[in-house]
Amino acid sequence: MGDHPIYVTDYRRPHNSPGDDILAAEMHEIARSGATLCDVQGDMFEPHPEQVCMGKEAIYKQMKYIESLKNAGAEVLMSSHLTKFAPAEEIIRIANEHIKRGADVVKIVSISATEEQLYENIRINGILKHEIDHPYLFLSGGAFSHLHRRIGFALGSCMCLCSVIDDEYRVKMQPELSKMKEIVKNFN
């Protein structure tokens, strides 16, 4: 893999999830094995529907966990997958929480269920560029998320999430890598 980054996730599973302590141990092993960017959920150690925990004990545990991943040689992306559309103020608040906990990269997924929400999420992407001095990935899910996922890099997001092939297992809203490369090339 040479100098290419390796971004890994180990999220809770919908059924029979092993628990956050086991997921943390798995991710730590992945970091020690050479992953360069480890995804830590924003509600690790205190599950919350919006993936942002605020309990002092859970936040302390997250900070220690993030420190251990960094000591293992990885950078940390903290992610919050919201189940609703969120206004700019809430997105900025969550981003600042991720930064306070030690994340190297902030990842927030909002919802674009309507065209108006899509336009607002695109606007928020630009606001984040000026409001936080930190690498971030802000994108959206939902019926109107496709455009946001394809142009977010041009609005300040530090990366794009893509699928390698278009098959039944891929996340449908993520663009195919070969198509995304063309978009990036034509943007420049």
Question: What annotation goes with each model-predicted range?
Answer:
Residues 1-19, 66-81:
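Chitinase-like catalytic core of GlcNAc-active glycosidases
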Residues 1-2, 30-32, 99-100, 131-132:
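Flexible, charged surface loops at secondary-structure boundaries
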Residues 5-55:
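Glycine/small-residue-rich loop that forms an oxyanion/phosphate-binding "nest" at active or ligand-binding sites
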Residues 42-188:
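Catalytic alpha/beta core domains of metabolic enzymes, predominantly
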